[in-house]
Amino acid sequence: MDIRRATEGDFDAMWPIFQAVIASGTTYSFDPGTSRADAHAYWFGPGLSSYVIEEGGRVVGMYKLRANQRDLGAHVANASFMVDPAHQGSGAGRAMGLHCLEEARRAGFLAMQFNFVVSTNEAAVRLWKALGFKVVGVLPRAFRHRQLGYVDAYVMHRFLEDVQAPG
């Protein structure tokens, strides 16, 4: 599998993955009827870098990296990931996670925070814990899961390097 920076030309391959992931109503807070234009803005908006993972020349997943907050909080990164449901379990998510951590370090971020990991998304929670993330907060009944009703969401965090207190 190869990971590279996404281009506008990749969006035609990214759109069906986005649609398939949000259609389940189990992992992302997007309305299943989210428009193509809104999805495009999510992946190619200002202040973010998007990447795709390809297998055999076909896009099978994507992630985006950005600052979690502006100005005095901009040293903490945030990222979002989607894998084509037909390729879940293939290692694409792990490969993108590792790539993203390295890209975040390279960009000068000191930590990474995921603001909203659905607690029942066991594969994602397991992956992020394996990559060094810790649950640092629980948002009670913050996600309206299509099958399970209201479930918790996690805030997950990890440092990207040892952080020294200033001066």
PLM feature spans:
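Conserved GNAT acetyl-CoA-binding A-motif
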Residues: A104-V117
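Conserved acetyl-CoA-binding loop-helix of GNAT-fold acetyltransferases
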Residues: G89-A104, R126-A130
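Acetyl-CoA-dependent GNAT
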Residues: E8, F30-A86, G97-L98, E103, ...
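Conserved beta-strand-loop-alpha-helix junction that forms the acyl-donor binding cleft
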Residues: Q88, F114-A124, F143
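A short beta-loop-alpha structural element at the N-terminal edge
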Residues: D2-M14
